A protein has these predicted regions:
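Interfacial/gating helices of multi-pass transporter permease domains
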Residues: 1-13, 80-83, 143-145
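Membrane-interface junctions at transmembrane-helix termini in multi-pass inner-membrane proteins
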Residues: 91-119
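Membrane-water interface segments that mark the loop-to-transmembrane alpha-helix transition
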Residues: 38-61, 119
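Residue-level recognition of transmembrane alpha-helices
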Residues: 6-9, 53, 89, 93, ...
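Helix-loop junctions and terminal segments of transmembrane helices
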Residues: 8, 12-37, 106-109
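Membrane-interface helix-loop junctions in multi-pass transport and translocation proteins
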Residues: 1, 68-69, 73, 111, ...
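Interfacial segments at transmembrane-helix termini and the short loops linking adjacent helices
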Residues: 47, 65-95, 141
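C-terminal transmembrane helix end/exit motif
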Residues: 22, 28, 101-106, 114, ...
Length: 172
């Protein structure tokens, strides 16, 4: 199981690398637009990055669904079916990409990064409470389900907190 997890994690690192340059490219612009209170351009950046991230994720998920088995068979092995694990991992990366946008292009630029410790601590609690059950019930797939659950909870909290901050910024 550890070997399968490691292979899937290595393959998902390729997807993670597709996301990072976008965050780096737009971070300074988002900080600038926030500081100058140029809400139209700030929102445009957030929406465009969000669209690109979703497109990358949907493309990866679709590719994995239709030809993942063949590609994995050519480069890794035909003996192990990694497609299901990769599908959950890719979906998890889509959820994480939303959190990345919230953190790097919204929460940190507006100076509210201190809230992240609390969010991640809560995520760790959720993980500790669910991991053992999920792993025992679903095996290796349970590990991926547990990570998906934790990332979804963290992302939903970030979206909610970002909305609250946004509402307060607009009022001022």
């Amino acid at each position: 199981a550890l070997g399968i997890y490691t292979i899937v994690e290595r393959l998902l690192n390729i997807l993670k690398q597709a996301y990072l340059p976008l965050i780096q490219a737009f971070y300074s612009k988002s900080c600038f637009f926030y500081e100058t209170r140029d809400w139209a351009n700030y929102a445009k950046i957030l929406i465009n990055v969000f669209k690109i991230y979703i497109l990358i994720g949907v493309f990866s998920l679709t590719t994995n669904y239709f030809i993942g088995e063949e590609i994995i068979g050519i480069f890794i092995t035909k003996d192990i079916n990694l497609v299901d694990y990769l599908s959950i991992g890719i979906f998890n990366q889509i959820i994480i990409s939303i959190a990345m946008i919230m953190v790097n292009l919204y929460i940190i630029p507006i100076g509210k990064g201190r809230v992240l410790k609390k969010i991640y601590f809560f995520g760790m609690i959720v993980f500790l409470l669910t991991f053992n059950y999920m792993q025992r019930s679903y095996g290796l797939m349970g590990v991926f389900y547990s990570m998906l659950l934790v990332e979804t909870v963290i992302t939903l909290i970030m979206v909610y907190i970002s909305y609250v901050y946004y509402r307060n910024i607009i009022k001022n």
